[in-house]
Amino acid sequence: MNTSASPVPGLFTLVLHTHLPWLAHHGRWPVGEEWLYQSWAAAYLPLLQVLAALADENRHRLITLGMTPVVNAQLDDPYCLNGVHHWLANWQLRAEEAASVRYARQSKSADYPSCTPEALRAFGIRECADAARALDNFATRWRHGGSPLLRGLIDAGTVELLGGPLAHPFQPLLAPRLREFALREGLADAQLRLAHRPKGIWAPECAYAPGMEVDYATAGVSHFMVDGPSLHGDTALGRPVGKTDVVAFGRDLQVSYRVWSPKSGYPGHAAYRDFHTYDHLTGLKPARVTGRNVPSEQKAPYDPERADRAVDVHVADFVDVVRNRLLSESERIGRPAHVIAAFDTELFGHWWYEGPTWLQRVLRALPAAGVRVGTLSDAIADGFVGDPVELPPSSWGSGKDWQVWSGAKVADLVQLNSEVVDTALTTIDKALAQTASLDGPLPRDHVADQILRETLLTVSSDWPFMVSKDSAADYARYRAHLHAHATREIAGALAAGRRDTARRLAEGWNRADGLFGALDARRLPK
């Protein structure tokens, strides 16, 4: 690492995007609530602990943190809070089992070097300590949900909050009325939970269609994230889009890919904990990566001291990468440049066990090495904005276009979404019109509200992504069709004049899909 504290020109911003689909009440393992609880325990708990520690050091404007409304809903949901508490306790039990192994047991992993009795005992002792700390952290800080913790970090100026639309839809393919509603209500949801209405958003999948900047301006959004290629790779400054003042910021792929890319990055280092190798009796992950082409049955036991040394190496490397990039980009454009590294939050801890430790150290090391760290709002306030630009239709998916969400592999889901949205909007319009014809103020319609909830869950961008990537594709199709069925079932009863049946159906579906309690169909744009 360049140990010189001489300042370099420009500004560095770290952006994290926190998102999972609505998983509560929809399966447990291997995809479902287990996915939520693993991410919560491995990423969300340590991330907020890291940020709180840095805030206690009087460090400000450290990261720009995107929190989707659907994740916030789960982090505050009593059912989910109870579920993750049980998950953490079960983790501790599994760690205690590993710590007490005395002889080789019959399992698929029994002959792995990382799963010998000696290796498991040593690993289990450390894992017990980790689980105990996580349980204590949860019990003392999280029992009232994630929002109080997030609000404290926002109030302290440690993070800038990015919001987004309800349920994470792929906005370019969404009917304009529902797109406007989802964004406006998503920003309002953040205001209700966190007492902050975000000025910036992480657009789901960094997806953009020409003209969306006008919608953003109308909703009070001042800036949003796109992927680097959307700006033709020139991400050194934010760019106002079209004829608006809404600024698009692009991810610097050269810097971001240093940490994580489809084929390389720090988490694949031989010393780090291997994500894919399990002890098949306890479900714990006791191996290190060892080598990129080393099979699980040959991976060495995890060595935390070796991993810790690798973290320091990668902190130093990243600091040098950021310094050099700021210097070269500032020289190229003839003024101080802005460099943005952006990642999914779940990378840090869930996919990369050592990620939170790396994050804490790098956020201390960058300022010490003369790098100014700030948020996207800081970039706008301090003039890191260039000339207006016209953006192409784009995303951060494969090909940097829309194919992951609109290609032949998911054509049936695109058609399903279109039909369900049409059904929902038509049904809600008729229901509200009938109620409006009565005397007095328009009452809230909980049946129409639930139709909107199920519709928004149907059009979540996660389902076509999972199908296109063949990642739990059957589960993704099941979820899309389940919520489509719920929408059609309630709407069908309502359209047939069976109001009591529609109400019972809506109440039933709400027991599983009761997120966004403030959602109100009366606010749907005309």
Curated annotation (Swiss-Prot):
InterPro entries: 57_glycoside_trans_central, BE_C, Branching_enz_MT3115-like, Glyco_hydro/deAcase_b/a-brl, Glyco_hydro_38_N_sf, Glyco_hydro_57/38_cen_sf, Glyco_hydro_57_N. One of its GO terms (molecular function) is 1,4-alpha-glucan branching enzyme activity. This is Probable 1,4-alpha-glucan branching enzyme Rv3031. It holds the Pfam family BE_C. Its EC number is 2.4.1.18. The lineage of its organism: Bacteria, Bacillati, Actinomycetota, Actinomycetes, Mycobacteriales. The active site is at residues 205, 344. The keyword Glycosyltransferase applies. Coiled coil: none annotated. GO terms for cellular component: extracellular region; plasma membrane. Catalyzes the formation of branch points in alpha-glucans by cleavage of an alpha-1,4 glycosidic bond and subsequent transfer of the cleaved-off oligosaccharide to a new alpha-1,6 position. Is probably involved in the biosynthesis of 6-O-methylglucosyl lipopolysaccharides (MGLP). Belongs to the glycosyl hydrolase 57 family. It is an enzyme of class 2 (transferase). Substrate binds at residues 251, 268, 396, 462. It catalyses: Transfers a segment of a (1->4)-alpha-D-glucan chain to a primary hydroxy group in a similar glucan chain. PANTHER family: 1,4-ALPHA-GLUCAN BRANCHING ENZYME RV3031-RELATED, 1,4-ALPHA-GLUCAN BRANCHING ENZYME TK1436. Keywords: Carbohydrate metabolism, Glycosyltransferase, Transferase. It comes from Mycobacterium tuberculosis (strain ATCC 25618 / H37Rv).
